[in-house]
Amino acid sequence: SPLHAQTPPTVAAASDLKFAIEEVAARFERDTGQKLRLVFGSSGNFYSQILQGAPFHLYMSADEDFVFKLADAGKTVDRGRLYAVGRIGVIVPHGSPLKADGEFKDLAAALKDGRLQKFAIANPEHAPYGARAKEALQHAGLWDAIQPKLVLGENISQTAQFATSGSTQGGVIALSLAKAPSVAKLGAFALIPEGWHQPLKQRMVLIKGAPPAARAFYEYIATPAAQEIMVRYGFAMPKEQ
């Protein structure tokens, strides 16, 4: 079929999708024979690149505002579709003096008693999972006190590496990464209450000029086969599409 004759479309996906979308893409390839090129990074960096004309075909953001801004700039075919709602939590590596505590009570105590040297979050300037971590720390009244201890990851996947490598005492990462066996085995994880931050409304959109294979994958993400994988990685499925 003509689908298979094309070069694989490029998907720019937020780093929280690293494990989930690799699995969805593998199933899509098995079901359709169509290959995809997956590129992972922070939603904000991809937004800037697409604005400057980067050759991406499907943009899967962790924050819907970036999608709306691209749509307003005339870069997309429409305003896209909500595909998942993400969650954040605290991960502490084995051997850390911190406890995995989603309400930051132990983190607050550790700031006072000197147990905390370094704590990882994604850069809130361009990584939505970092922006939500900042909101949660603000909610807990710890944002100012924790400033000197923060180590910023370029995206949430690098943040997960920082938080589990032993170079920090822990960090705030995506539930979807904590659910991956390769990350889960590195430490203990606790969800942060969802009311402590703005919801991580994850929206995807086709970029103007996207080939049919990109649209096929866009539609595939809404199928039960794909959603079953997303749910396994801790994503909530949006009510409105």
Predicted ranges, named:
Residues 5-54, 61-64, 68-76, 81-86, ...:
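Exported/periplasmic ABC-transporter solute-binding proteins
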Residues 1-2:
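Bacterial N-terminal signal peptides
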